[in-house]
Amino acid sequence: METTPLNSQKVLSECKDKEDCQENGVLQKGVPTPADKAGPGQISNGYSAVPSTSAGDEAPHSTPAATTTLVAEIHQGERETWGKKMDFLLSVIGYAVDLGNIWRFPYICYQNGGGAFLLPYTIMAIFGGIPLFYMELALGQYHRNGCISIWKKICPIFKGIGYAICIIAFYIASYYNTIIAWALYYLISSFTDQLPWTSCKNSWNTGNCTNYFAQDNITWTLHSTSPAEEFYLRHVLQIHQSKGLQDLGTISWQLALCIMLIFTIIYFSIWKGVKTSGKVVWVTATFPYIVLSVLLVRGATLPGAWRGVVFYLKPNWQKLLETGVWVDAAAQIFFSLGPGFGVLLAFASYNKFNNNCYQDALVTSVVNCMTSFVSGFVIFTVLGYMAEMRNEDVSEVAKDAGPSLLFITYAEAIANMPASTFFAIIFFLMLITLGLDSTFAGLEGVITAVLDEFPHIWAKRREWFVLIVVITCILGSLLTLTSGGAYVVTLLEEYATGPAVLTVALIEAVVVSWFYGITQFCSDVKEMLGFSPGWFWRICWVAISPLFLLFIICSFLMSPPQLRLFQYNYPHWSIILGYCIGTSSVICIPIYIIYRLISTPGTLKERIIKSITPETPTEIPCGDIRMNAV
């Protein structure tokens, strides 16, 4: 779909002799640039691969039609690149495949029609998630900047998008790593002969504790709780010591030590940049697949496993008539692939200029979706086993959602398997590695953005800046480490970050497609890859993907989730608080627009035109090439 960008630039042929065209983002005609002086064939921006000539000048040589010319490099500051292509792929896969793939997708799938849910999920992936994923990779790879400074080359007035992304990343780091700390606490507790959540004889247990798998005959009542439930609620979270958000209680020193250890690992994994994090992900991104394979085989051999699989995949086609199913499918694929968080921009900016990001987008998206699907078998074979042992329906066993599905239901199932200690250790180690590489990615998005925006301050002080970021995240996590920390985690996840990142992604998609222009963007992709995106991608970027995001946002606003955790109903003021926290990030966008218009000289029309016109052309790093079909 051809659209006329609102900040369209003059094409080279429209510039008259000796006219200054550099302001419009193209080469001056007849006036040599510094890069021209550096040697023949070198270029200084990203808008031409053929030397331009002034009116009346004779072309130095003719280029045969339908051939591809390779253009030599320009000289600019060296930018770090990935050591290997697999470093990049594993980092992107590790970022996209996170804890949500393990607990959220299986739960949403069975709740929304089982196998029938795969249809809306696939449709939303093809028309919404994957196009946005591809767009961010291409933007980052072409412009080679983080999520703040990249907007100078796209549409400067929307630079506030980058600041909003950084604030959202801080909020996510404030609660996401607490979940990893819970998993670490479980891992440490697993190094015993008998897992502590198998018995009702511990100091934290109550009189209601009832062991399903006890040898003696037991009576289960409405007030009965399992050992795994009491271990999670009363020992790990200590949630019984909190009355709610109005009284969070004290900080758990055990969880505080766990999160300190988590952030220490994070610091030494990312402090040197992608050269170090690219090596760490060879472990953190591959280990979960080894564990998932082991757990899948083990689960398939358990009695009653087939009951869980049938419950997971049995299609209920009537569900597809409900709007909520399509909303859940759209939200799941968006948050699973993760466009709009600035991470894909940052990771792709360290690629070589002519790296095939189109292929990367397809491969990593398919791997992510397949991981979610396979994780459902890992979870539901075990839930089927639990239902068989309890002599209950699978729906009764699978009523837990979110982290509780992993830390209560799945943990209890593991505890009652043969070799339970071994399976507990590898399972919680898998959860930790899944969380770590997602955190690596989230913080790298912020670090790259700030270092690119303020290179004169932080370029040679990366280690110190990373330390500041890590300490800030630890301080931001303190509320989630209290007895009522789980309430804070849920509030931040549902209201403070979800709607905000959807809004940011929507604005980003509209700006790239309609202000920067889909024609210009596709031209950029062609320069990198040698081929232009087809009509399917153009239509998705211009219309379908923005509508996809708008659909999720409107559905959320019309039917906001009713927050309830365990037996606690969130007060109304907490919902307002959540919206305020979310708005605190998105508000950066209009604030920067106002600042830009006020600080730019000229009439209002001149200010607007200058503010939506790219400030600087994009250059390619030394050693890379552009591919232009002439």
From Swiss-Prot:
Effect of loss of the gene = Mutant mice are born at the expected Mendelian rate. Knockdown results in loss of serotonin uptake in synaptosomes of brainstem and cortex, abnormal barrel cortex development, enteric nervous system hyperplasia and reduced peristaltic reflexes.
Disulfides per UniProt: C200-C209
Biological processes annotated in GO: behavioral response to cocaine; brain morphogenesis; cellular response to cGMP; cellular response to retinoic acid; circadian rhythm; conditioned place preference; enteric nervous system development; male mating behavior
For whether the record's keyword set contains Phosphoprotein, the answer is yes
Upper lineage is: Eukaryota, Metazoa, Chordata, Craniata, Vertebrata
Q: Does the record bear Membrane in its keywords? A: yes
Chain positions found as Phosphotyrosine: Y47, Y142
Name the residues that span the membrane.
88-112, 116-135, 161-186, 253-271, 278-297, 325-347, 361-380, 422-443, 464-483, 495-516, 539-558, 575-595
Name the gene behind this protein: Slc6a4
Which residues are modified to Phosphothreonine? T276
Bias (Polar residues) occurs at 1-11, 42-55
Positions binding Na(+) 1 in this chain are: G94, V97, L434, D437, S438
Q: Where in the cell is it found?
A: Cell membrane; Endomembrane system; Endosome membrane; Synapse
**What's the protein name?**
Sodium-dependent serotonin transporter
Induction (record text): Expressed in a circadian manner in the midbrain with a higher level expression seen during the dark phase (at protein level).
Provenance organism? Mus musculus
Q: Which residues form the signal peptide?
A: none
User: Reaction catalysed?
Assistant: serotonin(out) + K(+)(in) + Na(+)(out) + H(+)(in) = serotonin(in) + K(+)(out) + Na(+)(in) + H(+)(out)
Q: Which Pfam family is one of those matched by this entry?
A: SNF
Q: How does it assemble?
A: Monomer or homooligomer. Interacts (via C-terminus) with SCAMP2; the interaction is direct and retains transporter molecules intracellularly. Interacts with filamentous actin and STX1A. Interacts (via the N-terminus) with STX1A (via the H3 domain); this interaction regulates SLC4A6 channel conductance. Interacts with SEC23A, SEC24C and PATJ. Interacts with NOS1; the interaction may diminish the cell surface localization of SERT in the brain and, correspondingly, reduce serotonin reuptake. Interacts with TGFB1I1. Interacts with ITGAV:ITGB3.
Q: Where is this region: Disordered?
A: 1-63
What is the role of this chain? Serotonin transporter that cotransports serotonin with one Na(+) ion in exchange for one K(+) ion and possibly one proton in an overall electroneutral transport cycle. Transports serotonin across the plasma membrane from the extracellular compartment to the cytosol thus limiting serotonin intercellular signaling. Essential for serotonin homeostasis in the central nervous system.
